[in-house]
């Protein structure tokens, strides 16, 4: 009953043109009402074709100025629209929300289901409509395809989401590691500065101790000198105030004593001759530290392998070597079999390793080519680049040296009668002449450039006995280049750059300062790490990166 009443009321407030509930209804003189938009559109169309205005239902003419809004119908239509749009009355059943009719048709243009009244309305006029049963299967298939496509896209989206999360986690880990590295690097830098500060303070304390000790001794000497003068002055005053006999008794001796008195000046130190403290070159220190970090990226896992009968004993883990005295008396050559080779050998690339030489008083380390290539036993006379050895060493706990090639054929360029200049000029094309002349033992402390690329320091020609006990001498001993160490190295880093033909040594204890570098090396065979503990019984130990 209520449904029939709603249908009847709906018919009263339905626009005859659009068949929809009235929107802003206008009433004509004949009493019929239409939507404002519908009657306006009909008025324009009728004026264009017929030239007069008439009601679309009864064709009774009307004047546009007589159109009046119908508030009553507008309110009824609005209330009815609210009732029809409620879920209980409209969408609960398959009925049109506007007309209350069953939704049996599908409008292809709008893509919506409509009722038969909607099909006849102006909104759907001329559109292609089908029964819902006819198009349901077609659109079900389309929706199934769309569903599968969306599921694939969903999987892709989930994968992208997972990738983003994985990348986010990776970045977090990377940034965390970078943060850890930054903290570690700057801690090392602070440790370097703390170490430099400690060294400077220790040097200053040693200087203070030495200065005060010397000045205290000078003070004691001055006190004794003053006391001696006071005694002599008292003797003179006593003689002058005493009798003639006291005056003349031994007068020549005391006059001679006063004449021989020499005022001893105290030992002092001029302030301008003191070593003036200067803050360390932080930029240079950072550069040195950076270079060490760069070469440490090429860390090689090196183990020790005896290459010949040797006095050197290797540990079970093949990471440590030490000297062991042989019971039998070795031959002249065999006594120098202290060295061992490292494994693996290198024929290309960059490689770095570190050796702990703490507290040792003697050692030799570096690289050498295969003994099969050189046919040389590792004696001191063969520690030369031309023989396939690029090494540095320590002797007598304090003498650090690098072993360079001996300079043969310089006997013809020995200076005669002190004519250094003339000899050098006559033989300017022969660099060996300058090497023989410009040596510290000849009062020359110089550096030089040769062939536009080779820079050299001129040292005294080495003698075989300089680095050993002198039991065996040879004119072909290597040129031993003294190395000055401000900080005694406990760990020495060795860096081989095969393609660049260089071997570099770093003082890891001194924050990676370069000790020595061999350039223009000729590697014609595989290159092996080389270690010699010499006759010092303390071990040499290969270090691990984590240590």
Curated annotation (Swiss-Prot):
GO terms for biological process: activation of innate immune response; autophagy; defense response to virus; innate immune response; positive regulation of canonical NF-kappaB signal transduction; positive regulation of MAPK cascade; positive regulation of NF-kappaB transcription factor activity; protein K63-linked ubiquitination. A zinc finger (RING-type) spans 15-59. Pfam families: SPRY (PF00622), zf-B_box (PF00643), zf-RING_UBOX (PF13445). The modification Phosphoserine is found at residue 86. InterPro entries: B30.2/SPRY, B30.2/SPRY_sf, Butyrophylin_SPRY, ConA-like_dom_sf, SPRY_dom, TRIM/RBCC, Znf-RING_euk, Znf_B-box. It is found in: Cytoplasm; Nucleus. CDD domains: Bbox2_TRIM5-like, RING-HC_TRIM5-like_C-IV. Keywords: Acetylation, Antiviral defense, Autophagy, Coiled coil, Cytoplasm, Immunity, Innate immunity, Metal-binding, Nucleus, Phosphoprotein, Transferase, Ubl conjugation, Ubl conjugation pathway, Zinc, Zinc-finger. This is Tripartite motif-containing protein 5. It comes from Lagothrix lagotricha (Brown woolly monkey).
């Amino acid at each position: 009953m209520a449904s029939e009443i709603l249908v009847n009321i709906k018919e009263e407030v339905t626009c005859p043109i659009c068949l929809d509930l009235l929107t802003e209804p206008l009433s004509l003189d004949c009493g019929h009402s239409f939507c404002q938009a519908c009657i306006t559109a009909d008025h324009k169309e009728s004026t264009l074709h017929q030239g007069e205005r008439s009601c679309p239902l009864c064709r009774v003419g009307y004047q546009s100025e007589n159109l009046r809004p119908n508030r009553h119908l507008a309110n009824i239509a609005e209330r009815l629209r609210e009732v029809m749009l409620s879920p209980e009355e409209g969408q609960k059943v398959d009925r049109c929300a506007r007309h209350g009719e069953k939704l049996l048709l599908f409008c292809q243009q709008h893509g919506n289901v409509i009722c038969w009244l909607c099909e006849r309305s102006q909104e759907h006029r001329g559109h292609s409509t089908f029964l819902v049963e006819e198009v349901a299967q077609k659109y079900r298939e389309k929706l199934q395809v769309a569903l599968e496509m969306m599921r694939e896209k969903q999987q892709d989206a989930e994968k992208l989401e997972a990738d983003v999360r994985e990348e986010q986690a990776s970045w977090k880990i990377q940034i965390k590691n970078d943060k850890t590295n930054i903290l570690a690097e700057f801690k090392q830098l602070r440790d370097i500065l703390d170490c430099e500060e400690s060294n400077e303070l220790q040097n200053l304390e040693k200087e203070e101790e030495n200065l005060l000790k010397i000045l205290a001794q000078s003070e004691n000497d001055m006190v004794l000198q003053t006391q001696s003068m006071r005694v002599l002055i008292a003797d003179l005053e006593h003689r002058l105030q005493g009798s003639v006999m006291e005056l003349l008794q031994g007068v020549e001796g005391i006059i001679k004593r006063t004449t021989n008195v020499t005022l001893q000046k105290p030992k002092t130190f001029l302030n301008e001759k003191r070593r003036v403290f200067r803050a360390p070159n932080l930029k240079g220190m950072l550069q040195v530290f950076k270079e060490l970090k760069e070469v440490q990226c090429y860390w090689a896992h090196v183990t020790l392998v005896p290459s010949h009968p040797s006095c050197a004993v290797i540990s079970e883990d093949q990471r440590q070597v030490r000297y062991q005295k042989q019971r039998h008396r070795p031959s002249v050559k065999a006594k120098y079999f202290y060295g061992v080779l490292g494994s693996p050998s290198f024929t290309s690339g960059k490689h770095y390793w570190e050796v702990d030489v703490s507290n040792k008083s003697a050692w030799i380390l570096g690289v050498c080519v295969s003994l099969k290539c050189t046919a040389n036993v590792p004696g001191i006379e063969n520690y030369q680049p031309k023989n396939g050895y690029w090494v540095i060493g320590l002797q007598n706990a304090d003498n650090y040296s690098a072993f360079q090639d001996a300079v043969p054929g310089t006997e013809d360029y020995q200076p005669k009668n002190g004519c250094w200049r003339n000899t050098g000029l006559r033989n300017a094309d022969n660099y060996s002449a300058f090497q023989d002349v410009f040596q510290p033992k000849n009062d020359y402390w110089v550096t030089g450039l040769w062939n536009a690329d080779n820079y050299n320091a001129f040292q005294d020609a080495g003698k075989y006995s300089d680095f050993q006990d002198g039991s065996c001498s040879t004119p072909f001993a290597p040129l031993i280049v003294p190395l000055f160490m401000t900080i005694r190295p406990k760990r020495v880093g060795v860096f081989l750059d095969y393609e660049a033909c260089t071997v570099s040594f770093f003082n890891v204890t001194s924050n990676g300062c370069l000790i020595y570098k061999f350039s223009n090396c000729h590697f014609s065979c595989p290159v092996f790490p080389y270690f010699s503990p010499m006759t010092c019984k303390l071990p040499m130990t290969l270090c691990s990166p984590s240590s």
